[in-house]
C-alpha cells in the first residue's frame, strides 16, 4: 500500500500536466484561425475587452465602485445596502465590439461571499434594441460564463432577483449586493 499510493499520485500528476499542455496548445491554435475565401482574411482574436467607463445604480462608497468589476483584483463593487434591489450596471466600450461571452465572478473570499447578497436572476441588454438575455446565476463563488454573441458598444446588466447574505460564525449578514469581477470577451 505504501508503494501503490505514491505511484498513483505520480501517474495522476503526469497525466494532468500532459492534458493541460494539450489544452493550452489547442487554445493557441484556435486563436490563430484564418478564414479563406477569394482572399485570405485573418480573423481578429478573441480577447478580453475592457470598458472605458461604467455606471451603477448605486455604490456603497467610492471604494466599492463599479470600476472594481474590471480591475482584475479582489476588490468588489457593492450597492448602497439595497440587497441588489433595482440594481443596474452599465458598461461603455470605446468601439462597437462583437461580444462572445462574459464571465461573472461573485466574491471569491468565503466570508464576503457568504455574508453579502449576490445576483441571482439577471437581464443583459445592449444598445442593439432587440437584444436581451436572461440568466439565473448559481449561488457559488466560481466564475460563471454567459454567452452573448452580439455586437455592442454598451452593455447593461439588471439584477432581477438575489440570493440573500447569510450569518457566518455569529456575524450578521451584510445588506449590500456584491460582485467581484465581470470579464467581457469579444473581437473588435
Please report, for each region that a protein language model flagged, where it lies by residue:
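Short proline/glycine- and polar residue-rich coil/turn motifs
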Residues: 135-140
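A generic alpha-helix propensity feature with a strong bias for hydrophobic helices
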Residues: 9, 51-54, 167
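Disordered, acidic Ser/Thr/Pro-rich linker "stalks" and the adjacent N-terminal cap
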Residues: 1, 24-92
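Hydrophobic single-pass membrane-insertion segments
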Residues: 7-25
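Aromatic, loop-rich ligand-recognition surfaces of beta-strand-rich domains
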Residues: 67-130, 142-188
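Small/flexible residues
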Residues: 20, 34, 122-125
Amino acid at each position: 500500500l505504501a508503494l501503490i499510493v505514491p505511484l498513483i499520485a505520480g501517474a495522476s500528476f503526469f497525466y494532468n500536466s500532459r492534458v493541460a499542455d494539450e489544452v493550452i496548445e489547442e487554445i493557441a491554435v484556435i486563436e490563430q484561425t484564418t478564414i479563406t475565401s477569394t482572399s485570405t482574411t485573418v480573423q481578429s482574436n478573441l480577447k478580453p475587452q475592457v470598458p472605458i467607463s461604467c455606471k451603477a445604480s448605486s455604490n456603497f462608497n467610492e471604494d466599492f465602485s463599479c470600476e472594481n468589476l474590471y480591475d482584475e483584483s479582489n476588490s468588489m463593487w457593492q450597492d448602497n445596502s439595497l440587497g441588489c434591489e433595482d440594481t443596474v450596471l452599465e458598461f461603455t466600450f470605446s468601439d462597437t465590439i462583437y461580444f462572445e461571452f462574459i464571465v461573472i465572478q461573485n466574491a471569491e473570499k468565503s466570508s464576503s461571499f457568504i455574508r453579502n447578497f449576490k445576483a441571482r436572476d439577471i437581464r443583459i441588454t445592449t444598445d442593439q434594441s432587440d437584444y436581451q438575455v436572461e440568466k439565473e446565476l448559481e449561488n457559488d463563488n466560481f466564475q460563471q460564463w454567459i454567452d452573448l454573441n452580439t455586437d455592442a458598444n454598451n452593455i447593461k446588466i439588471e439584477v432581477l432577483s438575489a440570493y440573500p447574505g447569510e450569518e457566518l460564525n455569529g456575524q450578521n449578514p451584510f445588506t449590500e449586493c456584491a460582485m467581484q469581477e465581470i470579464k467581457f470577451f469579444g473581437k473588435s
